[in-house]
Amino acid sequence: MKFPGQRKSKHYFPTHSRDPLVNQIRQTPKLSRPTIIGVGQTIVDIEARVDDDFLERYELSKGHSLVLEEQKADALYRELTEKNLITHEYPGDTIGNTLHNYSVLADSKSVLLGVMSKNIEVGSYAYRYLCNTSSRMDLNYLQTVDGPIGRCYTLISDDGERTFALNVGQMNQLSPESIPEKVFKKSAALVVSSYLMRGEPTDPMPQAVQRAVELAKKHNVPVVLTLGTKYVIEGNETWWQEYLKENVTVVAMNEDEGEALTGEKDPLLAADKALEWVDLVLCTAGPVGLYMAGYTEDESKRETTFPLLPGNIAEFNKYEFSRSIKKEECRHPVKVYSHIAPYLGGPLEIKNTNGAGDAAL
C-alpha cells in the first residue's frame, strides 16, 4: 500500500519490521488515562455553489460574513438541498474537530460535551455531523435541544468569491447541569476554546465551560485552551491573561493570537511570554512551523542532538529533548523551547480535511 504525497518511505507498511509474533509479546502498555474531553459548539460547515441571484434573494452581501436569523437559515438550506447545490457538509467546530482528529490519529477515545438536535432527519445537516464524526468519539453525553445546531454556510459564487452566513441555532445552550463529573475521573485533558466565551449574555455556555474547568482542576486533569481567533483576544488581553493564570495548563495559538495576547510579534517571544501564565505553549507560525515552550527540572534537562537554531532567544532549542513538566512540580524550573518544521517542507497547497480544528493539539 503506497502512501500519497511526499514521504520518506515508499510503502505504508514497513517491509523490514520485526517478527509479528515477537511484536505481540512486546505490546505497548495501555495508557491509564487515554480519554480527552472537549466542550464544543456543535456547528456544521455547509459549502455550496450559488449564483449572484441566490445571494440577492437572501439579501447576502457578496464576499462578506453575515449572521442569519433562523427562519432565513432554514429557507436557505431548503433551497440548497432541493436544487442539489451543496458540495460538502462537515462538522465545523474547533473542539469537535480537534477531538475527531485526535481519535482518528491516536485511535483513542474522546468525549464531546455540547448540544444536539432532539429530532434529526436522515440526510439533514445534524445527521451529517454525526455521520462524519469518528466512531471513537463518545457523543452519548450531548445535551438534546429543541431546535437546530449551528450552521455556517460558505457560498461560493461563479467567480470564486466566498460569502459566509452563520446561524448559531442552539449551539451555545449547553447548560452546566449537562457536564457530568464521572467522565473526568479517567481523563487525560480537557480541551476548550476562546470561542465558547462569546455569545449572548443569556447563553449558559460560559457557565458550562467553567463547571468543566472546575471539575478538571478537581480531578487534576490538565486544561487546554485553543485561542481560536485574535478578535476574541484583542481588547481583552488582561482578562485572558488572568483567565490563563487561574485556569489553564496548556495554551495553543497562532502568531496573530499570540501577538494579541502578549504584544509580542515574534512567535517564539510570544510563547516565552505566555509561560508567565501557563505550563506549556504551542504556537503555530504558518509555513514556518510550530514553536513549543515549557518548563523542565534543571537537573533533568536534556541537550538536543540537532543543530542549534538562531532566534530572538539564542540557541533556544538547546534543551528541546527535555520532558515538559508543570512549573509547580519543578524544584528548580527552567524554560525549554523547541521548533518543529513542516514535514518535508509541507504540502504544495493546503487542503481542508474535515473543517476547523487545532491540528497542533
Residue ranges and their predicted role:
Residues 91-98, 356-361:
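Catalytic-loop motifs flanking and including active-site residues across diverse enzymes
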Residues 1-65, 86-90, 94, 107-109, ...:
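Ribokinase/PfkB-type carbohydrate-kinase core domain
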Residues 56-82:
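Active-site gating loops and adjacent loop-to-helix segments of metal-dependent hydrolytic enzymes
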Residues 75-80, 337-348, 358:
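The feature captures the short pre-catalytic strand/loop hairpin that immediately precedes
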Residues 259-260, 350-361:
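Short, small-residue alpha-helix embedded
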Residues 103-104:
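Gly/Ala-rich phosphate-binding loop of Rossmann-like dinucleotide-binding domains
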